[in-house]
A protein has these predicted regions:
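Alpha-helix initiation and N-capping motif
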Residues: 13, 17, 51, 80, ...
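Metallocofactor- and cofactor-centric catalytic cores in central/energy metabolism, strongly enriched
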Residues: 1-138, 152, 156, 162-165, ...
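Phosphate/pyrophosphate-binding betaalpha-module
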Residues: 144, 148-211
C-alpha cells in the first residue's frame, strides 16, 4: 500500500538502526544505567514503538518516556461526571467518541450510563452529532468535544454550521486541550530527565512546527516532529540523537509530507473564531495547567451545554494507588503501578491510560 509499505521497509529500518548504533557508540556517557531519555509525546507513537518492537531494536542506551499526548488519558474524573449528569437527562441524546465511553468517573462511565437507560451514542465526527440534532428536533443533542488541536477544527466547523443553520437543540461539552502549555508545564517542573522530544504529527499538522521553537529555546531541548510508521519513528530518533551528539538544539520536521511550518491556517482561523483559551484547565494526574484548555467564545456561548444545563464543576480525587500521573510525566513505567494488569486491565479498565487505544498502559498490556 502506497505511503505505508515504503515506511515499513525492513532493509531501511536495519540501515537506520545501524546508523543509530554507530552514533551512540561515540556517546560513551550514555549507558543502559544512564540512558538517553526521549519522550514520545503522542500515544500513537507509543503504540507504533511497541507494536513493531522498536524499543527492543534500539541501543540499550536509549530509553523512552511516554508523554501526556493522549486526550482521553488526561481526562479528569470530574469531567466524566459532568457528562454523565447531562446524559442521564431524559430529553438528551449524548454523543461521544468511542474512546471516552469506558473512562470512569465517580458516577461510573458513559457506557454504564447507557446500560442504565441514558441515550448515549458513539459518533465518528461532530458533524454526525449535528445531523442527529437536525433529525431529532424534540431532543437536546450534546456532543462531548474532546481532544487536542487535532480534533478542534472539526468541532469548530461543526459549531459554525450549527450557527449558520440556526440549530437550537445542539450543544457541546468542551474538553479540548492544547499541547504546548502542557509541555511548558512538564519542562518547567524539572521532575523528569528528558533529553529530547518526538513531537506529535497530527497536532503539528494543525499548529505547524513554529510553536515548538519557544520550548526549544527556553528549555534547550531538541524536538523532531514525526509521523506514525516505524521508519518515521526511527528516522526521527536518528535526527534527535544526531542533534544531541552535535550539541545542537533545534526544531526539526521529519513529517514534511504532512506538517508545514505554519500549519493549517484555515483550521487555525476556525479554531480562533469558535474557541478561546481558558485561564487554566485540570488534567488527570497532572493537576491544573495554565492556558492549556479552551472554552467557547461569546458568539458561541449559546452552544455551551454546561451553561445551558447549569452544571456545577465536579472535583474528584484520583485513586491514591493509581500512578496514572506518574506514568504520564515519565516518573514510572506502567508496570510499576500496583493496579497494572491486576485491578486495571483492558476488560476492567480502572485508569484512563488503560482505557484509551492510545494509552501507554494499554500499549504495555497489549504488546
Amino acid at each position: 500500500m502506497q505511503f505505508v509499505d515504503e515506511f515499513r521497509d525492513p532493509e531501511l529500518a536495519k540501515s537506520l538502526l545501524q546508523r543509530l548504533q554507530k552514533i551512540m557508540e561515540k556517546q560513551p556517557h550514555f549507558t543502559p544505567e544512564n540512558p538517553l531519555y526521549l519522550m514520545e509525546v503522542c500515544g500513537g507513537h507509543t503504540h507504533t514503538i511497541f507494536k513493531f518492537g522498536l524499543d527492543r531494536l534500539l541501543p540499550k542506551s536509549i530509553e523512552f518516556i511516554h508523554g501526556p499526548g493522549c486526550p482521553v488519558c488526561v481526562l479528569p474524573m470530574g469531567r466524566i461526571d459532568v457528562c454523565i449528569e447531562i446524559a442521564r437527562r431524559p430529553e438528551v441524546i449524548f454523543c461521544t467518541f468511542g474512546d471516552a465511553m469506558r473512562v470512569r468517573g465517580r458516577l461510573g462511565s458513559l457506557l454504564e450510563a447507557k446500560a442504565q437507560g441514558a441515550d448515549v451514542r458513539i459518533v465518528y465526527s461532530p458533524l454526525d452529532a449535528l445531523n442527529i440534532a437536525s433529525n431529532n428536533p424534540d431532543k437536546k443533542v450534546v456532543f462531548f468535544s474532546l481532544g487536542f488541536e487535532t480534533t478542534m477544527p472539526s468541532a469548530a466547523i461543526t459549531l459554525q454550521q450549527a450557527k449558520k443553520q440556526q440549530v437550537k437543540n445542539f450543544f457541546v461539552v468542551c474538553q479540548n486541550i492544547t499541547i504546548i502549555p502542557t509541555l511548558h508545564s512538564l519542562l518547567s517542573q524539572g521532575q523528569v530527565k528528558i533529553d529530547g522530544f518526538l513531537a506529535p504529527g497530527h497536532v503539528s499538522m494543525v499548529i505547524g512546527s513554529e510553536p515548538y521553537q519557544e520550548l526549544c529555546d527556553t528549555y534547550h531541548k531538541p524536538f523532531v516532529i514525526t509521523g506514525f510508521e516505524p521508519l518515521d519513528i526511527l528516522q526521527a530518533i536518528l535526527m534527535l540523537v544526531t542533534q544531541i551528539a552535535e550539541q545542537r538544539c533545534e526544531v526539526e520536521n521529519q513529517y514534511k509530507r504532512i506538517v508545514h511550518q505554519h500549519g493549517n491556517e484555515l483550521a487555525q482561523q476556525a479554531i480562533s473564531e469558535v474557541f478561546r483559551l481558558k485561564a487554566s484547565s485540570e488534567w488527570r494526574g497532572l493537576g491544573e495547567i495554565a492556558e492549556s484548555g479552551v472554552e467557547l467564545t461569546d458568539d458561541y456561548q449559546c452552544f455551551d451545554a454546561e451553561v445551558h444545563f447549569a452544571c456545577q464543576p465536579h472535583q474528584v480525587a484520583d485513586d491514591p494507588y493509581s500512578r496514572c500521573g506518574d506514568v504520564l510525566i515519565g516518573k514510572c513505567k506502567p508496570a510499576d503501578c500496583p493496579l497494572f494488569a491486576k485491578k486495571c486491565n483492558p476488560d476492567n479498565a480502572y485508569g484512563a491510560l488503560m482505557v484509551s487505544s492510545e494509552g501507554a498502559c494499554a500499549a504495555y498490556y497489549q504488546y
